[in-house]
Amino acid sequence: MRISFLSLVLTLAYGFGAAADVTRLAITSPEKITMKEDLGKDNPKWKFVAGRWVRRASGGREVLAQTAETQPWAVAILEDRKFDDLDATVRFRPISGKEDASGGLIFRAKDGRNYLLVRANALESNFRLYTTVNGKRSTIASAHVIEPTLGLWHKIRVVAKGQRIQAYLNEALLLDHEEKTFRGGWVGLWTKADSVTEFADLEVIGTPAK
């Protein structure tokens, strides 16, 4: 398992946040565009690769929920715009799960078996960045965190610029890693095992893939 040295330094030295002198990535290209996705509305460009994804009411609004409890992991890819560099955010609410209670943000996806992933888990005290290549998932960066609370909303953010990737949980920069497996692609959503998770407010600012 190849873990980013800088991710380890951030975790050990700064607990649950990054150092003040770590440069935050930003998408500044004049070619950048913004894509906001209302997850409570039907969109035929979603490809639900695995799991059971349903739109339902939650807290007075419509959300997209993954409700299957038997999948190894559930994957949904938004086959709309492809992005190279991006700043993507999504809110997730872990509802239940005994084996896993996770929510993840997929980016630079080629398809439902090849992508980068940042995920948090309400049952584990870690926040991780993965590659998934031909369906095989590998951890490439990890940080120690306080587990996201079941039943509450949390936010994942990932900023990818060239080979450098920074990932945030609830506004705290926790991962800073370089990875060249995938250069551009779609975004999507992810859960694992028996996780029942709701998602809302997916937004991407990025440069269209060339």
Which residues are covered by each model-predicted region?
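Short, aromatic/His-centered strand-loop micro-motif at the edge of beta-sheets
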Residues: 134-155
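Secretory/extracellular carbohydrate-interaction modules
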Residues: 68-133
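Beta-strand-rich interaction surfaces with strong enrichment in secreted/lumenal proteins
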Residues: 74-81, 142-148, 177, 189
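Short, solvent-exposed beta-strand-to-loop segments that form ligand-recognition rims
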Residues: 168-188
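Short tryptophan-centered beta-strand motifs in secreted/extracellular beta-sheet-rich domains
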Residues: 88-90, 151-167
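Extracellular carbohydrate-recognition regions
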Residues: 20-50, 200, 210
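Predominantly extracellular/luminal carbohydrate-interaction, adhesion, and secreted-enzyme modules
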Residues: 105, 181-197
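Extracellular glycan-recognition surfaces and repeat-rich motifs
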Residues: 38-72
